[in-house]
């Protein structure tokens, strides 16, 4: 397999074939909380992708010099440093979105996807493949966030990225926003529906009956 094909596989596989949320069931809490708007879902996707990619790269660079007994602490320190950078950048340039994301930016530190890729992949792989793996898993996480955020904002408020898409009754249109879509349970059901769709498309992901 060529280098280009390997890169494509590393980036695309976590989207449908091995999605961190849909198949591995990781990072679900933040997916429920930050998807009321497409804007916050998109920014969270960028933040997690940035942290996962650079933490993978950094851990891989020094993996042969990390004592096994403190490897988790070292990984956490690297991830926490990157999250602090992301948090400060958001507060400086996207303050309103930073307020909407609230504590969930800081909680990237404990996101199982970020920690999982650092431990399972970066500790055993070269820096560049680790970087690509981080990007792929960040995009896989973002695929679910953006899909859920799209439907929640569209049907919950009739808007996308804050701009009116469906003519609202309050403005003389025909669409009455469904407030239920803006509540956390709706995200839970949408994620479940998305998992169902993915497993129809990818039947090999269905667990075997015991």
UniProtKB/Swiss-Prot annotation:
Catalytic activity: a ubiquinone + n Na(+)(in) + NADH + H(+) = a ubiquinol + n Na(+)(out) + NAD(+)
A Pfam cross-reference name: Rnf-Nqr
E.C. code: 7.2.1.1
InterPro entries named in the record: NqrD, NqrDE/RnfAE
GO molecular function: oxidoreductase activity, acting on NAD(P)H, quinone or similar compound as acceptor
Cell compartments where the protein resides: Cell inner membrane
Keywords, sorted A to Z: Cell inner membrane, Cell membrane, Ion transport, Membrane, NAD, Sodium, Sodium transport, Translocase, Transmembrane, Transmembrane helix, Transport, Ubiquinone
Transmembrane segments: 42-62, 72-92, 103-123, 131-151, 178-198
Membrane topology (UniProt): Multi-pass membrane protein
Principal location class: membrane
EC category: translocase
Domain of life from the UniProt record: Bacteria
GO biological process: sodium ion transport
GO CC terms of this entry: plasma membrane
Protein family membership: Belongs to the NqrDE/RnfAE family.
Subunit record text: Composed of six subunits; NqrA, NqrB, NqrC, NqrD, NqrE and NqrF.
Protein name: Na(+)-translocating NADH-quinone reductase subunit D
Species, as recorded: Vibrio campbellii (strain ATCC BAA-1116)
């Amino acid at each position: 397999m060529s280098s280009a094909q390997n890169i494509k596989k590393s980036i695309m596989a976590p989207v449908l074939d091995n999605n961190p949320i849909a198949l591995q069931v990781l990072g679900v809490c933040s997916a429920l909380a930050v998807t009321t708007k497409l804007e916050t879902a998109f920014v969270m996707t960028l933040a997690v992708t940035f942290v996962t990619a650079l933490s993978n790269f950094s851990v891989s660079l020094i993996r042969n010099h990390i004592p096994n007994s403190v490897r988790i602490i070292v990984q956490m320190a690297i991830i926490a440093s990157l999250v602090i950078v992301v948090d400060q950048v958001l507060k400086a340039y996207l303050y309103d979105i930073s307020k909407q994301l609230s504590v969930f930016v800081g909680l990237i530190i404990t996101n199982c996807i970020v920690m999982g890729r650092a431990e399972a992949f970066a500790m055993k792989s070269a820096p560049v493949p680790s970087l690509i793996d981080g990007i792929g898993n960040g995009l896989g996480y973002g695929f679910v966030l953006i899909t859920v955020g799209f439907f929640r904002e569209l049907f919950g408020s009739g808007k996308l990225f804050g701009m009116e898409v469906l003519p609202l009754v309050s403005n003389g249109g025909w669409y009455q926003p469904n407030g239920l879509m803006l509540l956390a349970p709706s995200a839970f059901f949408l994620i479940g529906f998305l998992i169902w769709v993915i497993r129809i498309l990818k039947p090999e992901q269905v667990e075997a009956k015991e």
